[in-house]
């Protein structure tokens, strides 16, 4: 099993969710996060004064998948979240040893 983690722009969430659902992936965890990469934040103007904003609001999407689905899930997220502009995000895949569905005690792929 794999954990596909994506950091995306908030306005792309609906497209990412729909792309993952088309793969049959119906469960995901979404968290509001803040960070920066190469863009190193941005500046905003408030009441005529310019302020530097170091951290940019993003969403972290996490999806547990079977090994053979990971590449398709990554492609789906990338295609749905890409705007072609700085700050589109990152996607990475992490191996997962064990998953347990708390309610039933099911383990492994059955818990997905």
What positions do the PLM features span?
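Positively charged, small/polar-rich N-terminal and surface patches that mediate targeting and assembly
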Residues: 1-112
